[in-house]
């Protein structure tokens, strides 16, 4: 299903979502992470704060809806952003790591995987990762399909 087709289907249930679609895929393991969201095991994500300013992109907003894509740019589900915060990487909580639903869901696993990704993405953009680097933490709930 294309993002537009899924958006149109959900709009019949929730007309207040409007016409503007924000569709995206996770930065790594696109299919696995999209499937975790679809199954309700992944209800949070994190991204490197420095990349938002560099790309002139605004931070995610609570109450908005996003279409989650797979590696083929097909719509997997729609989520509503329920919480957005910014904090240093080294202050991300075990609770947030668990909500991300990846690996063994531990903070140690989360830090290992995300430090590697953030360091690489920031380096590619000419920025440096440190344990104090800010990260954008998002929490969401799957709203479609139910």
Segments predicted by a language model, with ranges:
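Mixed-charge, low-complexity intrinsically disordered regions
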Residues: 1-78, 84-146
């Amino acid at each position: 299903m294309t993002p537009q087709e899924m958006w149109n289907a959900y709009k019949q249930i929730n007309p207040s979502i409007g016409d503007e679609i924000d569709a995206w895929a996770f930065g790594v393991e696109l299919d696995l992470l999209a499937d975790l969201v679809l199954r309700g095991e992944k209800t949070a994500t994190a991204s490197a704060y420095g990349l938002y300013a560099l790309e002139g992109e605004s931070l995610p907003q609570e109450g908005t809806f996003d279409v989650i894509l797979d590696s083929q740019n097909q719509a997997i589900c729609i989520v509503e952003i329920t919480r957005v915060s910014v904090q240093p990487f080294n202050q991300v909580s075990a609770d947030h790591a668990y909500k991300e639903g990846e690996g063994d869901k531990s903070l140690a696993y989360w830090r290992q995987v995300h430090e590697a990704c953030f360091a690489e993405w920031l380096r590619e953009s000419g920025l440096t990762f440190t344990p104090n680097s800010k990260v954008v933490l998002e929490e969401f709930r799957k709203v479609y399909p139910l």
